[in-house]
Amino acid sequence: MAWRSGLCETDSRTLKQFLQEECMWKLVGKSRKHREYRAVACRSTIFSPEDDSSCILCQLLLLYRDGEWIICFCCNGRYQGHYGVNHVHRRRRRICHLPTLYQLSFGGPLGPASIDFLPSFSQVTSSMTCDGITPDVIYEVCMLVPQDEAKRILVKGHGAMDLTCQKAVTLGGAGAWLLPRPEGYTLFFYILCYDLFTSCGNRCDIPSMTRLMAAATACGQAGCSFCTDHEGHVDPTGNYVGCTPDMGRCLCYVPCGPMTQSLIHNEEPATFFCESDDAKYLCAVGSKTAAQVTLGDGLDYHIGVKDSEGRWLPVKTDVWDLVKVEEPVSRMIVCSCPVLKNLVH
């Protein structure tokens, strides 16, 4: 008996986009005739299963039969269907301290297909043995941003730009941006210099500026929307199935309070922003401004510190490095968080 499956044109484009752009695939089984992959995705705005969509478990069988690739797709334990495609490109991603992952891309639209069997997928196991994207991973893969490149990344302003400039997307809080490029995502953010991190940093959290400003201003009150975990993160390595608690390793954090002036509640992380004992407020806007601001402009164009009277104080600059993280780690960070993913997809 032949099993047929197909999609309308709109659904085909949406599913293809989801499988290619929002999933990092783990190889869980193979034979001479097939490969089986698994991915764990967070909530998506373009693809939503019928049941709880806060965590999307994706299982995919890849077959090559009669000159055509066949994709059999299962989502959250429910078989979604099988589809034909002209070409499949599998890109292996080896990342330090992490298991090998794959990115899949499909040549041409997903079309109807016919198979003579009902696909069976491997039993799903879930484990917390992998720590995911840790500070060690970030410091290993990140690169310092040269000044000439930083000057070409526009983060504020519109109007006429140099033809070499590119506009980045601001990610929530302070000091983090994403630049979508044809070759993939590039994350730019400020992070504590490595020597300072090793000597006095929290070795579990990624010490990004956005994380530390959120920690410094967190009021800690139950029910505070700024301080409460949105409970939508997933494990980007696909080892753990389900939503994971916040581990301080994302770039989705925002200050607790107005972006222009958030009260300091926790002194320890606040010391990374200002030397003065008079520091009262942290600001996710700069003490200086211009019609157009690039990453090459000084730190005081991006953040600020105020005293109790609202006067600007000098910002610490020597403790921060402007770094960039590229594919595939950049995509893993974005696609493990529904907040970041919604900003860029």
UniProtKB/Swiss-Prot annotation:
Q: Name one GO biological process term.
A: symbiont-mediated suppression of host innate immune response
Q: GO CC annotations?
A: host cell cytoplasm; host cell nucleus; viral tegument
Region annotation Nuclear localization signal 2: residue ranges? 90-94
Q: Where is it located?
A: Virion tegument; Host cytoplasm; Host nucleus
- UniProt region (Nuclear export signal), positions on chain: 55-63
- Positions of the UniProt region annotated as Nuclear localization signal 1: 26-35
Summary of the function given for this chain in its UniProt record = Plays a critical role in cytoplasmic virus egress. Participates in the final step of tegumentation and envelope acquisition within the host cytoplasm by directly interacting with the capsid. Upon virion binding to target cell, a signaling cascade is triggered to disrupt the interaction with the capsid, thereby preparing capsid uncoating. Additionally, antagonizes the viral DNA-triggered antiviral immune response by targeting host STING1 and preventing its dimerization and trafficking.
Record-stated family: Belongs to the herpesviridae cytoplasmic envelopment protein 2 family.
**Oligomer and partners:** Interacts with cytoplasmic envelopment protein 3 and with the capsid. Interacts with host STING1; this interaction prevents viral DNA-triggered antiviral immune response.
Q: What is this protein called?
A: Cytoplasmic envelopment protein 2
Organism of origin is: Human cytomegalovirus (strain AD169)
Gene from which this protein is expressed: UL94
